[in-house]
Design a protein with these regions (language model features):
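N-terminal Rossmann-like NAD(P)+-binding domain of SDR-like oxidoreductases, especially those catalyzing
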Residues: 1-136
Length: 136
């Protein structure tokens, strides 16, 4: 993790469980971290409270192209893309919301978002669906 020192890093979904842990770790090694959050009420987020004054919080909804355009001029060494529809069980009944959150937000970020050197897209085992044998 030492190679992230002084690197400009954007974490989408940084207020979520895994994203917040990565954000804290990046801050601890000296990275310059920006976090995209959907709602201004994230100020009450206990996961980021301990590092709130050490991160740049950007309120943006990646599903909205205009929101993504607003951050287009920013430049990052790395983007860690954690933002996703996090109700896996509900994704089967709320397909449109799941597609908007997972697919279109990623497309918007890649096509219209800030410049970056490396893009790290995060997934989960759910992408494999129900398998008789684990593919890993």
């Amino acid at each position: 993790m030492k190679h992230f020192k002084n690197k400009k890093i954007l974490v989408t979904g940084g207020a979520g469980f895994i994203g917040s842990h990565l954000t804290k770790r990046l801050v601890s090694v000296g990275a310059k971290v920006s976090v995209i959050v959907k709602y201004n009420s994230i100020i009450d987020c206990p996961r980021l409270l301990s590092i709130w004054d050490k991160i740049n919080v950007i309120e943006a909804d990646l599903r909205n192209v205009d929101s993504v355009y607003a951050i287009k001029k920013l430049k990052f060494d790395y983007i860690f893309h954690f933002a996703a529809y996090n109700h896996v069980g509900d994704s089967f009944t709320h397909v449109s919301e799941s597609i908007n959150s997972n697919l279109f937000s990623t497309i918007n970020l890649l096509d219209h978002g800030p410049k970056y050197k490396k893009f790290i897209h995060i997934g989960s085992s759910e992408i494999y669906g129900l398998q008789k044998k684990l593919p890993f």
